[in-house]
A protein has these predicted regions:
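Extended, subdomain-level signal for the structured scaffold at the beginning of enzyme domains
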Residues: 1-100, 109-117, 130-172
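Catalytic nucleophile serine of serine hydrolases
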Residues: 104
Length: 172
């Protein structure tokens, strides 16, 4: 049975590299990828790239997936950081032994759940994100990917392919 990953993007302004590079890596290793958001339909990225959100994350069961990833982009700060429904979804996924991950601003979204408290994480190297990690008792690590057994975080576009490879390796 093939592995399944749910990639969650904001309803606008996702980062194209952070979605498309990991998605391609996962699909090339046989992982079935579903793109989710807070709405379905076509979503425009930070650089006008287009993605199709097939499902609303809150309408699917985390346990149907082997991995859940929160993708970054300027819309992630605005729409996903404070989304209580998403935080509950990620905590539930973690409880059900689903691999939880985030890249760039998505790492901060994961940190806000408390799941990374006392641990290291990667995020985009800007103060607003690093400060949010610290505010959630997470130690910032200046590297492309930080992989724990249960949670993986990535820094952003430069580490997007490596983030995808880390997810794929964890799902093998």
């Amino acid at each position: 049975m093939s592995k399944k990953a749910l990639l969650i993007i904001p309803p606008e302004r996702f980062n194209e590299d952070e979605l498309f590079q990991p998605k391609e890596v996962l699909e090339n290793t046989g992982v079935a990828v579903t793109v989710a958001s807070t709405k379905t339909g076509e979503i425009t990225g930070d650089y006008l790239g287009k993605a199709l959100a097939e499902v609303i994350f809150s309408e699917v069961s985390a346990s149907d997936y082997d991995a859940v990833a929160v993708i970054g982009g300027s819309g992630t700060n605005d729409h996903l950081w404070g989304n209580q429904e998403l935080q509950s979804f990620l905590k539930q996924a973690h409880e059900q032994k689903v691999l939880v991950s985030g890249i760039c601003a998505g790492s901060v979204t994961v940190a806000k759940t408390g799941l990374l408290s006392g641990r290291k994480a990667a995020c985009y190297p800007v103060d607003v994100q690093i400060d949010e990690l610290k505010a959630n008792s997470v130690e910032y690590a200046k590297q492309h990917v930080v992989a724990h057994d249960d949670i993986i975080t990535g820094d952003g576009p430069d580490g997007a392919k490596e983030f995808g490879e880390s997810l794929a390796a964890a799902l093998r």
